[in-house]
């Protein structure tokens, strides 16, 4: 074979080898880029899936009550023994909301129950409390609410019902006077949360000052777990 032809053949083989190497390198870079992109997308999706009411690393448990599956963060449970998954007859939670004086954070105890086990406070107002009201009326409470003490003869010693007299679906809460010096007055409010589910709220009487914000803030908070 002539020397010139051998040189051309050798040069062509070198070019082919160089092209092959470049193609392999490009394929490797594309593969690595794809892996990196997959990790980035997975991290972003995990961040997007994290509900806004809990931290990234906080575990949420699935509890079923009143026909609803709820995703509840561990930190919401009031009692450690309820931190298990599955069906429940009652779920006790404790939340913190800015419902105190001047919007200070206040603890709100929430007990979730099947709707059939309780009556809402608005129903008790006409069906029970109205018949136990004393003649006197308290005007020392929050603006917009009327306070009516309950007759102690029926077991309502030291209890007052605070309600909005102008609404067809009024805010109603029953509060009991402090049982000891230095203790706070405590209130209860029961509401229906839709088909199959109800909630009993327990809170300090100072929260009544933000009674107009109470239900909207509670519903927004509970919506985060699927209610």
What function would you assign to each model-found segment?
Residues 103-191:
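Non-cytosolic head/periplasmic domains of membrane-anchored proteins
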Residues 59-65, 162, 190-192:
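Short acidic-hydrophobic surface loop/beta-edge motif
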Residues 195-227:
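Surface-exposed amphipathic alpha-helical segments
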Residues 68-119:
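Extracytoplasmic/periplasmic/luminal assembly and interaction segments
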Residues 1-19:
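N-terminal Lys/Arg-rich, disordered targeting/topogenic segments
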Residues 76, 177-179, 203-205:
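A mature extracytoplasmic/lumenal domain signature
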């Amino acid at each position: 074979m002539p020397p010139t032809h051998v040189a051309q053949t050798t040069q062509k083989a070198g070019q082919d080898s160089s092209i092959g190497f470049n193609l392999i390198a490009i394929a490797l870079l594309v593969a690595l880029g794809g892996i990196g992109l997959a990790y980035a997308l997975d991290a972003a999706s995990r961040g997007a899936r994290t509900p806004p009411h809990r931290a990234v690393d906080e575990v949420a448990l699935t509890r079923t009550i009143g026909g609803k599956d709820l995703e509840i963060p561990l930190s919401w449970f009031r009692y450690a023994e309820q931190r298990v998954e599955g069906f429940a007859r009652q779920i006790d939670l404790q939340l913190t909301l800015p419902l105190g004086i001047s919007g200070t954070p206040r603890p709100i105890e929430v007990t979730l129950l099947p709707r059939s086990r309780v009556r809402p406070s608005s129903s008790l107002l006409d069906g029970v409390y109205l018949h136990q009201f004393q003649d006197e009326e308290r005007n020392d409470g929050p603006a917009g609410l009327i306070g009516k003490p309950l007759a102690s003869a029926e077991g309502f010693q030291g209890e007052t019902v605070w309600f909005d007299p102008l609404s067809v679906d009024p805010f109603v809460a029953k509060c009991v006077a402090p049982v000891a010096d230095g203790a706070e007055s405590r209130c209860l409010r029961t509401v229906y949360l839709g088909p199959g589910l109800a909630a009993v709220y327990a809170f300090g009487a100072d929260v009544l000052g933000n009674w107009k914000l109470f239900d909207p803030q509670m519903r927004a908070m509970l919506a985060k777990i699927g209610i």
